[in-house]
């Protein structure tokens, strides 16, 4: 077969056997063991007048017990390469029988590692014949080849590959003894002469093994596992009835690949195919015709995927004969190494020529490659990725968008300005269906690289277990009302930008200008893009962004004001429709001059700052804010269900049932917990400020009286055991004198004075012992608890509604976050009983009752003891003894009143009732006959009024 430059061939030689008989030196391959030798089938002589006949005559003098087993299927060929070439193998007695030492499938091992036994004559003769015949045949072939010189460099690469494999495989375990039966092991000895000009790293081939299988009952399968260790390559073939050989040669020239130690590659090629059913097994003879080509090395130039697909050429042919298994196993392979000064290529062949079966369909090759990327410094993200098996060394494809991943090496890009804390190893696993379509699957750990630009790229998110995410990079420039940069900022609602707010102010409402130092439009756009995950896919977001993109900015002229929803202390709320859409919004309009005269501008600024930082399902969403004609407008979410005060008035008894009350106050409790974690004390909790969404869930609104303060999260360890938890000690029958006939809680036990009506079977049964608390539950309750409660906040402001004011606010002693738990108790009382607990004839009497009057519960309606106990512990006049003052909402959620409530899935709970969706008058206001009647806003006295015109 003709050779060509840049490739390595394995061809058949017809005269190899005849040339080997002139050999005069004998050596032995130290493979296998004498114990396994006895279990192999005897080799029968077959070639009279040839070198094989002489060898078989010598073999007959050696007693070999034939194996009674009759093996079906193809034999297991073990092909091993040695680092020594041109010299005979050691015939030390310590290596006796090493040729038949079984090796594990997929685990290479050095042939020199094995038990110390004596060498047999048969092994010495076999090694002699193979080495001398290979040497002479190689010399003859090279003398006839005129184009031998172009193949020198390729042969050197293969030879150096062998040496590295042998060096690295010395410490690997071997094959179990029972797997070593019926093995035919063939040794290849390449030349060891390496020219000084060669720059390739020592490389090796792994062991080629073929294990016999049940060839009749099971389909033939071939699995090829290529190990590329370091910068070398190797071959390991594991097959059942079929063999597939792929040779991978890599050049390690300077600049073509990464530096040494860049990573390990493991490529698995799985092929499933079925042999034709008409094939009849005659003998376990396999002929392998291997066409070995070298893959192009990793270089700066791009390599076409078609060339890479053509670079791996593999073929396997399995021959079979009628079942004459008693003859045993026979296979030969000759290797022809050159002399010490000559350069030759590896030649592997089998001497039998058997008719070939029908060609099989082309098999699908699956490659699995493992790469390693090392972060070498704090200014570099990763080093170059060695992608010699991919279409291009500097380009990868993303799995989702199939876009190119830009190279992160320092040669093509300047160092990033983002500093990284530590240097980490980055491991990338790529699963490829073919060489032409590499796909990135997972990046285990990496540091985040903040790069500038507006192009789409694949970056890595900064997390403990990072994954590849598609991210559209946005320009850091502020929103200017026009340009592509603004469009990109608005079009990316899940941006990874982070925003910090100063929470250092404790008692001032106007000290938040530092958090809004940027323009209000820009600051809002950043929040609307990055901090609205639960509302990012809302249609109203898309409508607002579309109007901003179309007109450059958003103003009051883009809304149709439909009707007035309510009037507050600093502004009026209107129902509005965005022009050209069917989206309804609630717009809070505030007159800046009016606020300045009343000195309420800090309250408006505080509310705007709080709304920007909120992102909670039970808190309002701020879609936009703008100033138009001296009017400050806040575009918020519209709740068609009205407020909780109106909804309570619609009930038959003017109050909610206990399950409905538990539903509403649980969501309010979560909203207050979120606000306290942000350092916001609400201070104005009442039913009028609790709106009902269209899905029946609540939304807390109106933050103009809220106080922003510092919050220090702390870990508190539980000091009392779970069975003595103060939040759970309260119960109708927690004491021995348990008489509470009005308790209607189903979970309560029967009162002591009630008659016991038990059946006969129940009387005979032994009383069950109370279940001990679960160990896991005890451990969970004993774990440290995170508390983010602004316990140190203090304010002397007299704010709030009279009926909901806490005693400490009325006394002027200063108040903190505990005022929210007082108002929470008043709200719970009002929802259950339909009125507040301390209401008087006028405001003065109301304030007096709050400070001096004791808490009383009316006789009707009937309320459970748990609800009363919770109200009693919340309405403690001493703020330090009030429930929630120490641990906040976490302490209240553990109360028996909320027992059985799934706090994590409360959004999935069915609300008590859904609001009535009524016509808001949008059709009349926007009809052509009405000429798009708008509402005019103007300040009259102390109120804001909108008039039709």
UniProtKB/Swiss-Prot annotation:
ATP binds at residues 565-573, 588. The active site is at 684 (proton acceptor). Residues 81-94, 513-525 have a biased composition (Low complexity). Residues 79-116, 323-344, 407-426, 495-525 are annotated as: Disordered. Residues 407-420, 495-512 have a biased composition (Polar residues). InterPro entries: Kinase-like_dom_sf (IPR011009), Prot_kinase_dom (IPR000719), Ser/Thr_kinase_AS (IPR008271). Keywords: ATP-binding, Kinase, Nucleotide-binding, Serine/threonine-protein kinase, Transferase. GO terms for molecular function: ATP binding; kinase activity; protein kinase binding; protein serine kinase activity; protein serine/threonine kinase activity. Its EC number is 2.7.11.1. It catalyses: L-seryl-[protein] + ATP = O-phospho-L-seryl-[protein] + ADP + H(+); L-threonyl-[protein] + ATP = O-phospho-L-threonyl-[protein] + ADP + H(+). The keyword NAD does not apply. Residues 559-898 form the Protein kinase domain. It comes from the Eukaryota. Serine/threonine-protein kinase that could be involved in the negative regulation of root growth. PANTHER family: FLIPPASE KINASE 1-RELATED (PTHR45637). Interacts with KCBP, PERK8, PERK9, PERK10 and PERK13. Belongs to the protein kinase superfamily. Ser/Thr protein kinase family. This is Serine/threonine-protein kinase KIPK2.
């Amino acid at each position: 077969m003709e050779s060509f430059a840049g490739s390595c061939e394995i061809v058949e030689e017809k005269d190899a056997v005849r040339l080997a008989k002139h050999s005069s030196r004998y050596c032995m391959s130290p493979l296998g063991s004498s114990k396994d030798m006895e279990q192999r089938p005897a080799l029968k002589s077959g070639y009279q007048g040839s070198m094989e006949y002489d060898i078989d005559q010598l073999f007959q003098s050696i007693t070999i017990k034939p194996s009674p087993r009759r093996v079906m299927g193809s034999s297991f060929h073990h092909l091993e390469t040695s680092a020594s070439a041109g010299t005979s193998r050691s015939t030390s007695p310590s290596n006796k029988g090493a040729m038949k030492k079984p090796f594990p499938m997929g685990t290479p091992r050095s042939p020199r590692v094995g038990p110390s036994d004596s060498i047999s004559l048969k092994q010495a003769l076999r090694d002699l014949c193979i080495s001398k015949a290979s040497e002479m045949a190689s010399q003859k072939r090279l003398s006839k080849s005129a184009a031998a010189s172009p193949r020198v460099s390729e042969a050197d690469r293969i030879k150096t590959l062998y040496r590295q494999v042998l060096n690295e495989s010395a410490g690997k375990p071997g094959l179990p003894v029972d797997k070593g039966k019926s093995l035919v092991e063939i040794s290849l000895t390449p030349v060891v002469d390496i020219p000084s000009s060669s720059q390739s790293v020592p490389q090796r081939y792994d062991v080629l093994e073929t294990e016999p299988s049940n060839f009749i009952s099971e389909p033939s399968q071939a699995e090829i596992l290529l190990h590329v260790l370091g910068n070398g390559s190797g071959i390991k073939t594991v097959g059942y009835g079929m063999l597939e050989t792929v040779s991978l040669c890599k050049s390690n020239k300077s600049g073509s690949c990464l530096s040494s130690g860049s990573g390990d590659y493991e490529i698995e090629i799985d092929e499933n195919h079925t042999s034709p059913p008409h094939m009849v097994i005659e003998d376990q003879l396999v002929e392998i015709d291997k066409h070995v080509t070298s893959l192009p090395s990793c270089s700066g130039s791009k390599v076409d995927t078609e060339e890479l697909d053509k670079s791996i050429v593999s073929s396997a042919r399995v021959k079979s004969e009628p079942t004459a298994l008693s003859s045993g196993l026979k296979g030969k392979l000759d290797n022809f190494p050159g002399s010490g000064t000559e350069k030759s290529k590896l030649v592997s062949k089998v001497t039998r020529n058997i008719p070939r079966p029908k060609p099989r369909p082309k098999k699908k090759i699956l490659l699995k490659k493992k790469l390693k990327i090392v972060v070498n410094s704090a200014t570099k993200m990763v080093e170059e990725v060695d992608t010699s098996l991919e279409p291009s060394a500097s380009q990868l494809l993303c799995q989702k968008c199939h876009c190119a991943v830009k190279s992160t090496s320092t040669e093509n890009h300047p160092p990033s300005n983002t500093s990284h804390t530590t240097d980490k190893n980055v491991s990338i696993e790529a699963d490829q269906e073919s060489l032409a379509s590499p796909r990135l699957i997972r990046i285990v750990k990496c540091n985040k690289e903040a790069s500038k630009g507006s192009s789409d790229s694949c970056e890595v998110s900064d997390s403990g277990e990072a994954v590849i995410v598609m991210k559209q990079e946005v320009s850091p420039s502020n929103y200017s009302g026009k340009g592509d940069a603004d469009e990109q900022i608005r079009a990316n609602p899940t941006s990874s930008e982070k925003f910090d707010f100063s929470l250092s102010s404790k008692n001032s409402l106007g000290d938040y200008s530092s958090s809004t130092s940027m323009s209000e439009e820009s600051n809002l756009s950043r929040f609307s893009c990055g901090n609205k995950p639960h509302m990012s896919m809302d249609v109203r977001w898309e409508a607002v962004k579309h109007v901003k993109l179309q007109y450059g900015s958003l103003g009051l002229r883009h809304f149709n004001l439909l009707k007035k929803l309510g009037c507050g202390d600093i502004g009026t709320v209107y129902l509005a429709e965005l022009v050209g859409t069917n989206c309804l919004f609630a717009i809070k309009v505030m007159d800046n001059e009016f606020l300045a005269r009343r000195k309420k501008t800090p309250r408006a600024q505080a509310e705007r700052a709080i709304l920007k930082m909120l992102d909670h399902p039970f808190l309002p969403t701020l879609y936009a804010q703008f100033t138009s004609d001296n009017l400050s407008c806040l575009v918020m979410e519209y709740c068609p269900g009205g407020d909780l005060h109106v909804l309570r008035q619609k009930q038959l008894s003017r109050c909610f049932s206990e399950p409905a009350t538990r539903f509403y106050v649980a969501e309010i409790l979560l909203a207050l917990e979120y606000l306290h974690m942000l350092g916001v004390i609400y201070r104005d909790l009442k039913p009028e400020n609790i709106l009902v969404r269209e899905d029946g869930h609540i939304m807390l609104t109106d933050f103009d009286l809220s106080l922003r303060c510092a919050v220090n999260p702390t870990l508190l360890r539980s000091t009392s055991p779970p069975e003595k938890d103060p939040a759970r000690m309260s119960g109708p029958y927690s004491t021995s004198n348990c008489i509470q006939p009005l308790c209607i809680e189903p979970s309560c036990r029967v009162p002591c004075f009630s008659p016991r009506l038990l059946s006969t079977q129940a009387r005979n049964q032994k009383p069950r012992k109370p279940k001990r608390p679960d160990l896991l539950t005890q451990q969970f309750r004993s774990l440290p608890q995170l508390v983010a409660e602004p316990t140190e906040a203090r304010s002397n402001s007299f704010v709030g509604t009279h009926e909901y004011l806490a005693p400490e606010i009325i006394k002027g002693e200063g108040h903190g976050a505990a005022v929210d738990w007082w108002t929470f108790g008043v709200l719970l009382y009002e929802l259950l009983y339909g009125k507040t607990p301390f209401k008087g004839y006028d405001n003065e009497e109301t304030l007096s009752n709050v400070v001096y009057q004791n808490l009383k519960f009316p006789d009707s309606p009937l309320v459970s003891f748990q609800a009363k106990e919770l109200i009693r512990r919340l309405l403690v006049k001493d703020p330090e003894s009030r429930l929630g003052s120490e641990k906040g909402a976490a302490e209240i959620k553990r109360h028996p009143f909320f027992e059985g409530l799934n706090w994590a899935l409360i959004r999935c709970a069915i609300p008590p009732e859904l609001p009535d969706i009524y016509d808001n008058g949008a059709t009349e206001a926007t009809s052509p006959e009405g000429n798009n009647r708008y509402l005019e806003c103007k300040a009259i006295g102390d109120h804001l009024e909108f008039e039709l015109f």
